[in-house]
């Protein structure tokens, strides 16, 4: 069992100020076999590379700030309190166009986070 306290992740200081920080927070050491989890911390002006997952499904829980999620070329505004499901195969990215941090918790199948991550080149979008 692992308890995730949102206020702890909202208050967490970014160890790489001005840069994206995405540590894994749910690992096999927590007895997680089919799920993984990570904190996404996107400072103002940062963007996750446009990508997709062949097998992974994700639930993203936005916990502070606001941003844009682009899924298959369509923009969706997101903010604290929003929850997003992304099925396997959908190309997506998260962008922070605001002046403050955007933070989210992401829980996903097929861990670890790097195992099923395929960046989409500009000409493939």
Q: Where are the model-predicted features located?
A:
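Short, conserved beta-strand element in jelly-roll/cupin
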Residues: 41-43, 52-71, 107-110
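A short beta-loop-beta micro-motif enriched in histidine and acidic residues
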Residues: 25-36, 46-59, 72, 80
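Short beta-strand His + acidic residue motifs that chelate non-heme Fe in jelly-roll/DSBH
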Residues: 50, 69-70, 86, 92-98
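A generic "binding-loop/recognition-motif" signal
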Residues: 55, 74, 90-91, 100
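Short acidic-glycine-tyrosine-enriched beta hairpin
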Residues: 73-88
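A short, N-terminal "cap"/entry segment at the start of jelly-roll beta-barrel domains
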Residues: 1-35, 117-125
